[in-house]
Amino acid sequence: MSKICQITGKKAMIGNNVSHSKRRTKRTFDLNLFNKKFYYVEQDCWISLSLCANGLRIINKKGLDAALNDAVAKGFCDWKSIKVIG
């Protein structure tokens, strides 16, 4: 599973750990990703999405259909990458 939100397109960032003596070592800042199931009324099926917390807020605000259409239009996901359950 890639660490990319399917709604917002956010990815893990790369930065530095900085110690008390200011030595820098590379690290990754991971997203708050989780898999969430939604009932997609237009297709009459359940779908599973890999979302970050901000992506879930966007779905709550716009609705599932509008959020998916925006994500596909912006190139963050395509209809083939959306997992259909049942």
From Swiss-Prot:
Organism domain of life: Bacteria
Could you tell me one molecular function GO term of this UniProt entry? structural constituent of ribosome
The cross-references to InterPro entries, in alphabetical order and at most eight, read:
Ribosomal_bL28 (IPR026569), Ribosomal_bL28/bL31-like_sf (IPR034704), Ribosomal_bL28_bact-type (IPR001383), Ribosomal_bL28_sf (IPR037147)
What protein name applies here?
Large ribosomal subunit protein bL28
The text of the family note is: Belongs to the bacterial ribosomal protein bL28 family.
Q: What is the native source organism of this protein?
A: Bacteroides thetaiotaomicron (strain ATCC 29148 / DSM 2079 / JCM 5827 / CCUG 10774 / NCTC 10582 / VPI-5482 / E50)
This protein's GO CC annotations: ribonucleoprotein complex; ribosome
Name of the gene encoding the protein in the UniProt record: rpmB
NCBIfam families per UniProt: L28
The coiled-coil segments of this chain are none
Gene Ontology BP term (one): translation
